[in-house]
């Protein structure tokens, strides 16, 4: 069987177009455009690329995009002070602080300082807790983007055995909660997991997020499985590959995401959706 390719680039563009139409309708109705503040500390080249793509996406859909590029020498106190100012700014619906932060700044303290209603990355413990309790508000972008891909391809997830490889706070853990909401029987594997192959071979839906090129061989994939590859790894020759050996896995899977052009574009598209949601649901004047 040759797998159908899940085209994240096309779906992400659809999502962004839908958001752009809603923003145009808001502005036409006399409401303000949503505002996103993107904070970058230091000059990490990968972070600069990510931030540029987020700012570009913002402007394309008609958001007000505010950029805060702070020097590497910025102190934790200065960064927290900026977040306090942005929390109090009624024209800003989302605050995004690009990770990783320089040494000496506590990521957890910074992410927890962002007001949960402006936490468009979905990392605040309040938002993660809401997802745990089956009452989500702003949801972590990559897991939510993956669920959107599955929905747009009309893949019925109820009753599937889902296996998540990797237990990070950004992808693996929140992904497991999204999969529970999507009706899956969910297993999360990590570096202490014994006999990883056994888990992979029994997965109807496999989500791999470890950041190691070719970590999952294609012959481990169950015939007809759905494979979602979150990894983005640049090889020495400049080629970008995922965590799964794509060519071999595509011979066995029913659906597979490519790298690049699979999950990556959905992360930014979901960030855009979250910012609109924050604006409409939490920051618009409510009818009394």
Curated annotation (Swiss-Prot):
Phylogenetic classification of the source organism: Bacteria, Pseudomonadati, Pseudomonadota, Gammaproteobacteria, Enterobacterales
Presence of keyword Ligase: no
A single GO cellular-component term on record: cytosol
Name this protein carries in UniProt: Bifunctional protein FolD
GO molecular function term, any single one: methylenetetrahydrofolate dehydrogenase (NADP+) activity
Reaction catalysis annotation: (6R)-5,10-methylene-5,6,7,8-tetrahydrofolate + NADP(+) = (6R)-5,10-methenyltetrahydrofolate + NADPH; (6R)-5,10-methenyltetrahydrofolate + H2O = (6R)-10-formyltetrahydrofolate + H(+)
Enzyme Commission identifier(s): 1.5.1.5, 3.5.4.9
Similarity comment: Belongs to the tetrahydrofolate dehydrogenase/cyclohydrolase family.
Gene behind the chain: folD
Subunit details: Homodimer.
Stretches that traverse the bilayer: none
Role this protein plays: Catalyzes the oxidation of 5,10-methylenetetrahydrofolate to 5,10-methenyltetrahydrofolate and then the hydrolysis of 5,10-methenyltetrahydrofolate to 10-formyltetrahydrofolate.
Binding locations of NADP(+): 166-168, 232
Originating organism: Escherichia fergusonii (strain ATCC 35469 / DSM 13698 / CCUG 18766 / IAM 14443 / JCM 21226 / LMG 7866 / NBRC 102419 / NCTC 12128 / CDC 0568-73)
InterPro entries given in the database record: Aminoacid_DH-like_N_sf, NAD(P)-bd_dom_sf, THF_DH/CycHdrlase, THF_DH/CycHdrlase_cat_dom, THF_DH/CycHdrlase_CS, THF_DH/CycHdrlase_NAD-bd_dom
GO BP of this protein: L-histidine biosynthetic process; methionine biosynthetic process; purine nucleotide biosynthetic process; tetrahydrofolate interconversion
Pathway recorded for this protein: One-carbon metabolism; tetrahydrofolate interconversion
């Amino acid at each position: 069987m040759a797998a159908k390719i899940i085209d994240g680039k096309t779906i992400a563009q659809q999502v962004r177009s839908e958001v752009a139409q809603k923003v145009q309708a808001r502005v036409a109705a006399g409401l303000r455009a949503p505002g996103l503040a993107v904070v970058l500390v230091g000059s990490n080249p990968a972070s600069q690329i990510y931030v540029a793509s987020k700012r570009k996406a913002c402007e394309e859909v008609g958001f007000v995009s505010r950029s805060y590029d702070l020097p590497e020498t910025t102190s934790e106190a200065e960064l927290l002070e900026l977040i306090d100012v942005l929390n109090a700014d009624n024209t800003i619906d989302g605050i995004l602080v690009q990770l990783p932060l320089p040494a000496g700044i506590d990521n957890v303290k910074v992410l927890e300082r962002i007001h949960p209603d402006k936490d468009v990355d979905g990392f605040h413990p309040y938002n993660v807790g809401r997802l745990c309790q089956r009452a989500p508000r702003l949801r972590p972008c990559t897991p939510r983007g993956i669920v959107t891909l599955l929905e747009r391809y009309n893949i019925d997830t109820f009753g599937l055995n889902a296996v998540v490889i990797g237990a990070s706070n950004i992808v693996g853990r929140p992904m497991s909660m999204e999969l529970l909401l999507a009706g899956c029987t969910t297993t999360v594997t990590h570096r202490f997991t014994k006999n990883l192959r056994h888990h992979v071979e029994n997965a109807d839906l496999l989500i791999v997020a470890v950041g190691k090129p070719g970590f999952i061989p294609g012959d481990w994939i169950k015939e007809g499985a759905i494979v979602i590859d979150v990894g983005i790894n640049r090889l020495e020759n400049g080629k970008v590959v995922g965590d799964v050996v794509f060519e071999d896995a595509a011979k066995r899977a029913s659906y597979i995401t490519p790298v690049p052009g699979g999950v990556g574009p959905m992360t930014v598209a979901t960030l855009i959706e979250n910012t609109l949601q924050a604006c409409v649901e939490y920051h618009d004047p409510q009818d009394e």
